[in-house]
Amino acid sequence: MRKNKLSFKEKAGAEQEECLCFCEGEASREAMFQAPIELPEGFVVDPAEAVANVTWNADSLSCVSDRCLIQTGPEPDEVGVQFAVRLQGTVTLLVSVSPVRNQYGQGDGAVSVIHNAEIDQVVYYSDESDDCPDISDITIENLVVVPPFYGSPLSVTGTIVLVPEPEPVYAFTANPNDQSVSVIDTNTDTVVTTIALPYNPAGIEITPDKSAVFVLHPNNNVISVIDYDTLTVTATILLDQPPRLIRFIPNHEFAYVFTGTAVYVIGIDTLTVDRSIPVEGYDVAIDPNGLFAYVLNFGIVQKVDLTTGEVTGTIERELIVSTIETNWPERYAYVLEQEFFFNYLTVIDLNTFTISSTQELEYEGEYRMFTSGAEVYLYDGFTGNLYSVSPNGAGVIGNVPQSATDYAFTPNGDFLYATRFIEQSIIVYNTDDYSEETVISLGVSPGAITI
């Protein structure tokens, strides 16, 4: 939740100008309704077999956003602004019940009534003033036909889902000392569950379609597969070499696992090894077209055909090439070169397999390169600067003073999650200014993270 902070003076002025109150009203995304059904004389409905059906119209609903205050810290002047998103108006329901029979049990008709459900409620709080929901997403759930009792007529009850709950976006951390994976709901910044594993985990990545999570166990030559929806281990892939890193490409059917001496191509749906390509090195990136691997080995970058295993090109560098990344759909590779206190970022055009540019980075910088989603980033542990990497080079986008084990951005780019191994926690940074948003305590030591 992003916090729009106000000074105490601004808060007082805002209160005087707009009579702001604190955000204390309860928010609910649902509204209950009960529609009485009057049956024509001489007709009956058996509630045990009756079925209800509802169609609706919400054209008269409107959305308003009311400013309100939230406490952002323990001090009285630590106050921010949010917006209470309220829906007001009427949802018109056409409620039907069937079968309707005559007093002799004959017939198979239906009876319908129009019921107006009055709506006036806060559905959620937001950081944005224009964050109204899509009215077309309204659904009706939990329909129940209630038999008449104590003079009350037959009725239909149900729930109007005004705003669906957001789909969970999970962060997964590999906890090597605990043989587990922690699952965090990034909508609420809470730990949903901890998944026990048979071995110590190292690397961890989510498939592009978010159907599964692949967890690497290099000490055991094993990959565990976690179902994204059920959050359970559903499969184990056995290799004859230790998996050291894993890559995925959007819209491709394979996972690419590097062992240091080979690239294993594994079917995401079949969870079987399709083929392995012998190649030696210590880091690898996959071409966005899925046809080539780019392998680092001391001072060289090799281009390897993932079908034949043939080395089709080599680029030599003077410094040690330490890390390589690609980002989809752009066909560029980014190589971090480091030796002693010197640091360079080299951009390779994959269409021609030639160097596009080389950028000198900060002297004595402690750089690491990582991907999150389709983007590539650099982090300098010496200065705390965070860089976005593109074909034009690297540019500073923020400063994160506390170094971490691993980093991952939420898909919308609003927050950066940083794992802290010794502290057994995750720091969540707001990417507006890279201020600390919250700290999530895990109770275990997290290593790699993926969102």
Swiss-Prot record:
Q: Which residues form a coiled coil?
A: none
Family annotation (Gene3D superfamilies): YVTN repeat-like/Quinoprotein amine dehydrogenase (2.130.10.10)
Deleted gene: phenotype: Non-essential, it can be disrupted. No PcrA-related phenotype.
Entry's SUPFAM superfamilies?
Nitrous oxide reductase, N-terminal domain
How does this polypeptide assemble, per the annotation? Interacts with PcrA. The interaction is not essential for cell viability or repair of UV-induced lesions.
For this entry, the protein name equals: Protein YwhK
Q: Which organism is it from?
A: Bacillus subtilis (strain 168)
